[in-house]
């Protein structure tokens, strides 16, 4: 058996091929897993659990079917869907996890997260993140009419796209000191995360020992998952 990790699907109505690929993944690979962990940015945007978007209802039902089959499903918020709440988690049968979580997997201690908190060189983004994660601001936003939230979210996405276009690739990647600090704080030799869309297995030193950082790929033209078994930790890409 295996534990599976995915991230950065950025599901939206404009990308039906990705949605179809995810549904096939849930019907096949996910059903055979010990557990499924979704490490953020499952959706391209999330403006509240009360959004009647048909895609959200479809995904909730599909994930719930996996959960009901006996495969536990877990979710860590990403930078796109950090407002996903308890209502959707309940509808989809997912358990919401904190932004950093340590798992005991087949004899390994593994730290999992979305990954945006590791990009400490992107000072502008980190300031924005700190602001939008304030509970009072989230409560205020979610109290707004749905059409107002949609307009605000569209404007924020446009601003983010414009800002990122002028940033260097290095700034938007993880900071190595932040990586080592997180791994040493949690006393782990394995870290799995998404966010950067740069799939790879990196070797480093943490806790004065060899360590590994596994980065999930985004679901653009193919699927990406990390498969952890008693024997191995694999980064796997597969066609939709």
Curated annotation (Swiss-Prot):
Mn(2+) 1 binds at residues 8, 10, 41, 197. It is an enzyme of class 3 (hydrolase). Substrate binds at residues 79-80, 122, 160, 164, 167, 195. It is a peripheral membrane protein. Keywords: Cell inner membrane, Cell membrane, Hydrolase, Lipid A biosynthesis, Lipid biosynthesis, Lipid metabolism, Manganese, Membrane, Metal-binding. Its cofactor is Mn(2+). CDD domains: MPP_YbbF-LpxH. InterPro entries: Calcineurin-like_PHP_ApaH, LpxH-like, Metallo-depent_PP-like, UDP-diacylglucosamine_Hdrlase. GO terms for molecular function: manganese ion binding; UDP-2,3-diacylglucosamine hydrolase activity. Mn(2+) 2 binds at residues 41, 79, 114, 195. Binds 2 Mn(2+) ions per subunit in a binuclear metal center. GO terms for cellular component: cytoplasm; extrinsic component of plasma membrane. Pathway: Glycolipid biosynthesis; lipid IV(A) biosynthesis; lipid IV(A) from (3R)-3-hydroxytetradecanoyl-[acyl-carrier-protein] and UDP-N-acetyl-alpha-D-glucosamine: step 4/6. It catalyses: UDP-2-N,3-O-bis[(3R)-3-hydroxytetradecanoyl]-alpha-D-glucosamine + H2O = 2-N,3-O-bis[(3R)-3-hydroxytetradecanoyl]-alpha-D-glucosaminyl 1-phosphate + UMP + 2 H(+). Hydrolyzes the pyrophosphate bond of UDP-2,3-diacylglucosamine to yield 2,3-diacylglucosamine 1-phosphate (lipid X) and UMP by catalyzing the attack of water at the alpha-P atom. Involved in the biosynthesis of lipid A, a phosphorylated glycolipid that anchors the lipopolysaccharide to the outer membrane of the cell. Belongs to the LpxH family. HAMAP family: LpxH (MF_00575). This is UDP-2,3-diacylglucosamine hydrolase. It comes from Escherichia coli O7:K1 (strain IAI39 / ExPEC). The lineage of its organism: Bacteria, Pseudomonadati, Pseudomonadota, Gammaproteobacteria, Enterobacterales.
């Amino acid at each position: 058996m295996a534990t599976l990790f995915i991230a950065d699907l950025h599901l939206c109505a404009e990308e039906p091929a990705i949605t179809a690929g995810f549904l096939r993944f849930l019907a096949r690979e996910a059903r055979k897993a010990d557990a499924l962990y979704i490490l953020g940015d499952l959706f391209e945007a999330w403006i509240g659990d009360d959004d009647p978007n048909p895609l959200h209802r479809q995904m909730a039902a599909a994930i719930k079917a996996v959960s009901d089959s006996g495969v536990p499903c877990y979710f860590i918020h990403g930078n796109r869907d950090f407002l996903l709440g308890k209502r959707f988690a309940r509808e989809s049968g997912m358990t919401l996890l904190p932004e950093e979580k340590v798992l005991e997997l087949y004899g390994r201690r593994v730290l999992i997260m979305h990954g945006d908190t590791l990009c400490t060189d992107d000072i502008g983004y980190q300031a924005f993140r700190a602001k939008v994660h304030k509970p009072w601001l989230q409560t205020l936003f979610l109290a707004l009419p749905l059409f107002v939230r949609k307009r605000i979210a569209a404007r924020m996405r446009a601003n983010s796209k414009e800002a990122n276009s002028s940033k260097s690739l290095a700034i938007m990647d993880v900071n190595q000191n932040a990586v080592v600090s997180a791994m040493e704080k949690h006393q782990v030799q394995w870290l799995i995360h998404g966010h950067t869309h740069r799939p790879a297995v990196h070797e480093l030193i943490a806790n004065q020992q060899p360590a590994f950082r596994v980065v999930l790929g985004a679901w653009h033209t193919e699927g990406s998952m990390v498969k952890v078994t008693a024997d191995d930790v694999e980064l796997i890409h597969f066609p939709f």
